[in-house]
A protein has these predicted regions:
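Conserved Ig-like domain signature around the intradomain disulfide
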Residues: 536, 565-569
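Surface-exposed, flexible coil segments in extracellular/virion-facing regions
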Residues: 541-558
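Acidic, low-complexity Ser/Thr/Gly/Pro-rich repeat segments typical of extracellular/periplasmic
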Residues: 41-174
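Sequence-level preference for short, compositionally simple segments enriched
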Residues: 172-505
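Solvent-exposed loop segments of extracellular immunoglobulin-like
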Residues: 531-539
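Surface-exposed, proline-enriched loop/turn segments that connect beta strands in immunoglobulin-like
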Residues: 54-56, 511-515
Length: 601
């Protein structure tokens, strides 16, 4: 090869090497701005960010939004600071040192809640600020290099200037006294967190207010007090999820034990008195007329992680709380109710004393699942002045292989009154033959007169009576006709809950019937879901006229013909009120005729 071509070949190699080095030095990760694309440079070996939320230059951002970064690979927390600054004056409004894994903040006006400022799920790092931002303000985010790394230790190069990640918050809050507030994790609602919406409601609220939570997972601890007349309503029971790993080790109650000897009932003390548990996922303290419906509360504390309620209601004997169509997940102490509450159509699982408190509480049509052998479904500590926990038409079951559980336990020397009554309940093998437990196993009823462990018509899945022959000595088997009055009384929520209260919730439609287009001969199912107490009646209509026999939540047409086309809706009612669904249009499409000359074989 002559020298001229040798030089050209060397030059070409140098160009390729230079381009490769340039690519390594300036590998680009594209992060979407609102309405445009903007490159963010980082080294090829570095952890690459592919998206941020709120988007760059986003507007109308919720004040309570978490910040989220999506990476090309799974991140871990490194070292460094994250800052949020006011773009108008470059003042830092929040600084997070990522090496400090746990911080403290006020929630719902109560100080000293521990929380995780950064939560990583798969490729997404969510950053939680200690307080809400301000309305009508532009902010930018700075992140030091190395604050996040990939699992090989390669750093995220961060954001270092005011233009890299900036956004503007909503211009103004919702109208004062608004009767509905919308929470949406994607930022399309009035608030991005459930707590943010609750905080907006004024103390002593007298206006019935619905906080509607769209589908999504909300990683937050909820606490509020003095916020009355609230309905917390999820868009979808399984897909609207409030979750957090809060527990007694993470948020220990430094103010004392609410159940210490001589302590007042938990729902009677002010929140700032100190004797209020901070360990639950969702805590409502001293509120009245609270309804929680159509969502999931999941305390993600692992088994053995100490007491970890999914829901704590610290009310009074006049709290008038309604919990309906709610799934509750945890292990130890899943549900604690101190005060008046009606619980309907709920799923509750846990392993030790996973339903407990002072009551009075009435459970109807609930599924209760034990996750451990030989443990306890309940531990009820009601005062003599009110009833405890009553279960009607509920199922006591266990996870696969779980057996030998007690329906309840108590130590009468410490808590002399404990009332747990089962009416028409289904008991599986998860419940042991003894059924109940006292600290002193053979203690006679005469020595614990205020312990009421009573059952009527406990049966298995085939409807056969449960064998009561081995029940604890103190337990009582109610029978007809002798115990007819007691059976009737304990089957009535008004009797159990007291204060002359009959739980009522006018129907709230949670899933509307959907329009559909089908061909002749196909099957059609129209349906609607509601939260309501008592259970509602349904009447489907076509073109505004009642359809005979269409009186269920689902209306089915087995084989559609052209005459079925039209507008359908359902009227749903109970003694508390009536609601009419949106119109669902049924379009019937005729099979198309083939045209043209058929092909000959």
């Amino acid at each position: 090869m002559n020298d001229k071509y040798r030089w050209l070949r060397v030059a070409a190699v140098l160009v390729v090497v230079w381009l490769g080095c340039l690519a390594m030095t300036h590998a680009v990760a594209v992060i979407a701005r609102e309405g445009e694309k903007a490159p963010v440079t980082s080294q090829q070996a570095a952890l690459i960010a592919t998206a941020v939320f709120p988007a760059i230059n986003a507007k109308n951002v919720c004040l309570d939004t978490p910040l989220r970064i999506t990476f090309a690979s799974g991140p871990i927390v490194g070292d460094g600071e994250i800052q949020v600054l006011d773009a108008s004056n470059d003042i830092v409004v929040e600084t997070i040192n990522v090496s400090v894994r746990i911080r403290s903040k006020s929630i719902g006006g109560l100080p000293n809640f521990n929380y995780y400022p950064i939560i990583i799920n798969d490729h997404v790092a969510s950053i939680y600020l200690s307080h809400a931002l301000a309305y009508n303000t532009t902010y930018y985010v700075k992140i030091e290099a190395g604050a996040f790394k990939d699992r090989s230790g390669n750093p995220f190069t961060g954001f270092t200037n005011a233009e890299a990640w900036r956004f503007k918050t909503k211009a103004a809050p919702p109208v004062a006294g608004a009767k509905e507030l919308v929470v949406a994790a994607d930022g399309t609602g009035d608030f991005a967190s459930v707590q943010g919406a609750i905080d907006f409601v004024p103390p002593g609220n007298k206006t019935p207010t619905t906080i509607f939570i769209r589908q999504g997972t909300y990683n937050e601890i909820i606490f509020f007090t003095g916020k009355d007349n609230l309905t917390i309503l999820g868009e979808d029971r399984q897909k609207t999820i409030i979750a957090y790993a809060n527990n007694d080790r993470f948020n220990n109650n430094a103010g004392g034990n609410p159940f210490a000897p001589g302590a007042p009932l938990p729902g009677t003390v002010p929140a700032r008195s100190g004797a209020v548990y901070r360990r639950g996922l969702f805590l409502a303290h001293r509120v009245t007329n609270l309804t929680i419906a159509n969502l999931t509360l999941h305390n993600t504390t692992p088994q053995g992680g100490s007491q970890a309620e999914a829901l704590i209601l610290n009310g009074t004997p006049r709290a008038r709380a309604i919990i309906t169509n709610v799934d509750l997940y945890s292990f130890q102490d899943t549900l604690q109710i101190n005060g008046q509450a009606f619980v309907q159509n709920c799923y509750i699982e846990g392993d030790v004393d996973f339903m407990w408190g002072t009551g009075p509480s009435f459970f109807e049509n609930c599924e209760l699942k034990a996750l451990r052998n030989g443990a306890y479904f309940t531990q009820i500590r009601n005062p003599i002045s009110n009833h405890g926990y009553v279960f009607k038409n509920c199922t006591f079951e266990g996870a696969p292989g779980i057996t030998g559980n007690f329906l309840s336990r108590i130590a009468p020397a410490r808590f002399p009154a404990s009332e747990v009554v089962l009416i028409d309940c289904l008991l599986t093998d998860a419940v042991g033959a003894v059924g109940w437990r006292l600290d002193q196993v053979n203690q006679p009823a005469s020595e614990a007169p205020n312990v009421h462990y009573w059952e009527y018509n406990s049966h298995d899945s085939a409807g056969r009576p449960v064998d009561m022959s081995q029940r604890l000595v103190i337990a009582r088997h109610l029978k007809l006709p002798d115990d007819g009055k007691s059976i009737a009384n304990y089957g009535d929520p008004k009797f159990v809950l007291g204060d002359d209260w009959t739980p009522l919730l006018a129907p709230i439609i949670t899933t509307q019937p959907a329009s559909v287009s089908v061909s002749i001969g196909q099957k059609v199912i129209l349906s609607a879901s509601v939260a309501a107490v008592p259970a509602p009646k349904y009447q489907w209509q076509k073109s505004g006229r009642n359809i005979t026999g269409a009186a269920q939540s689902v209306y089915a047409i087995g084989s559609v013909d052209s005459r079925d086309a039209g507008s359908y809706r359902v009227v749903i009612s109970n003694i508390a009120g009536k609601v009419t669904s949106r119109v669902a249009k049924l379009t019937v499409v005729s099979a198309r005729r083939r045209t043209g000359i058929p092909r000959l074989p």
